[in-house]
Amino acid sequence: VSVQIVFVHGIRTSATMWRSQLEYLEEQGIPATAVDLPGHGTRMSEDFTVHEAMHTIDAAVRAAAAHGPVLLVGHSMGGLLALAYVGGAQRPQVAGLIAASCTSLPRGAGLAAYRAIARAVDRLPDRGMWITKRILEATIPEETRSDFAAGGYALDTQDTALGNLATLDLATAVARIRVPLWFVNGQWDQLRVNEPLFRRLAPHAELIVVPRTTHLFTAMRPQIFNAVLRLAVATIEAAQTTGTAAGPIPPEEWE
């Protein structure tokens, strides 16, 4: 029985951000799928809500779990949603979780400042596309540079999605998680701000910091992220073999 991987993209982008990883996993013979969240990619015309985003993740996980243990992988907003999902009141069929570029609680002054900057950029004549293209050209290798934009940018969804993220009780969710968990951040990622808190909430989790990379490290250094995927797959396979796989804390054990 092979480990099944489900990818959840970040804000503004879509499932296409994972093209490099999907290609690599196909070569390795590891089944994988990448979802489009509401308001993004092929679902650009839909309204974004946390409820529908969670339903999307749950449907993909359930479908994958019919074929083997599931490794859930989320980046940025996708990572936050994945943490909330795995640490939620239900016990999803997830055997391991990679939470990339998301060790930050989306609330308070930090979230307000981020939304203000995003709104200011969105008011530019080209809605900030010139800036986005220059940043990608300066930081992302040519072979993965187009992956973030290939499914379109969800500019009309961004502010709504950010506001919705503030409703997540991430501190409670992260503390409940008992499956193998990896926090993976770029060295210069602005969302490392609450990294120490996340490590305290999930002391069993592994922290991997990718040197000389930013928030978009999955595309900056895809080979390193592929190595993290291999590590997670091997860990889940070993746990399945020895029968040591863990799950989220059941409700009766919550403090």
Predicted regions and their residues:
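Active-site loop/oxyanion-hole signature of alpha/beta-hydrolase fold enzymes
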Residues: 31-71, 227
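Conserved HGGG/HGGXW glycine-rich cap/lid loop of the alpha/beta-hydrolase fold
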Residues: 2-42
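Short beta-strand/loop motif that positions the catalytic acidic residue
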Residues: 177, 183-185
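Flexible "cap/lid" loop of the alpha/beta hydrolase fold
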Residues: 84-125
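Conserved alpha/beta-hydrolase "acid-adjacent" motif
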Residues: 190-196
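Conserved alpha/beta-hydrolase catalytic His-Asp/Glu region
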Residues: 108, 125-176
